[in-house]
From Swiss-Prot:
Coiled coil: none
Subcellular location: Cell inner membrane
NCBIfam families: membrane protein insertion efficiency factor YidD (TIGR00278)
Keywords for the protein's UniProt record, in alphabetical order: Cell inner membrane, Cell membrane, Membrane
Membrane topology: Peripheral membrane protein
Any one of the GO CC terms: plasma membrane
UniProt entry tagged with the keyword Membrane: yes
Taxonomy of the source species: Bacteria, Pseudomonadati, Pseudomonadota, Gammaproteobacteria, Legionellales
Family the entry assigns: Belongs to the UPF0161 family.
InterPro entries attached to this UniProt entry: Membr_insert_effic_factor_YidD (IPR002696)
Protein name as it appears in the record: Putative membrane protein insertion efficiency factor
Main location: membrane
Disulfide pairings: none
Length: 81
């Protein structure tokens, strides 16, 4: 079961990594948060699993818009950067 979960996480994270390496460098940075939404999604999926990680990523993406205050929004609330 552990290998299947790991493989599923890697498959789900693949489009995020492709975005980070191929698309993100070509566009101007527009994420209102730090870490960026793609970094947040990748970390959430790897740490919490596919279902909870995707829900956390979708929640984050829904808050990232031009009218958002943005700022520092870590995956782990006690993380101080």
């Amino acid at each position: 079961m552990g290998k299947i979960n790991l493989m599923l996480r890697q498959i789900v994270c693949l489009p995020i990594k492709m975005y980070q390496y191929f698309i993100s460098p070509l566009i101007t940075p527009c994420c209102r948060y730090y870490p960026s939404c793609s970094e947040y999604a990748d970390s959430a999926i790897k740490h919490y699993g596919v279902i909870k990680g995707l829900l956390m990523a979708l929640n984050r993406l829904s808050r990232c818009h031009p009218w958002s205050k943005g700022g520092y929004d870590p995956l782990f609330p006690n993380d101080k950067n």
